[in-house]
Regions:
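Residue-level signal for secondary-structure boundary elements
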Residues: 24, 28, 55-59, 70
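Amphipathic alpha-helical packing elements
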Residues: 43-65
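Short terminal alpha-helical segments
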Residues: 1-35
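Amphipathic alpha-helical binding modules
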Residues: 66-106
């Protein structure tokens, strides 16, 4: 089955500090409040990943996250689904989990 990460406040803070310039941290943290859905921390982590350290891209990701949170999560956690015909289902799940954890735990 597909890997579903558990994301904590500490994880979000760690990812922010790791992937974004220090001078942007307060601005980015202030945007977290706009995410009001059930999977809030998971969506914030996905936005951080998808934006790749770019604050403007992060803002764009976050601006659609409440309405399109599944797409946001899918882009971050399950990028191989778009190329599904190239892989077996097990390969897709294994590789997606591997790529997400590689980013999440570095």
């Amino acid at each position: 089955s597909q890997y579903t990460p558990t994301v904590t406040e500490e994880d979000v803070e760690r990812l922010l500090k790791r992937d974004y310039l220090r001078e942007t941290h307060d601005e980015i943290r202030s945007l977290f409040i706009s995410v009001t859905i059930r999977e809030r921390l998971r969506v914030i982590a996905a936005c951080l990943k998808n934006a790749g350290g770019d604050v403007e891209h992060f803002k764009a990701q976050l601006s659609t996250a409440n309405g399109y949170w599944r797409e946001t999560i899918s882009e971050a956690e399950y990028p191989r689904v778009k190329r599904a015909s190239q892989y077996t289902e097990t390969e897709i799940h294994d590789k997606q989990r591997e790529q997400y954890l590689s980013w999440f735990e570095r």
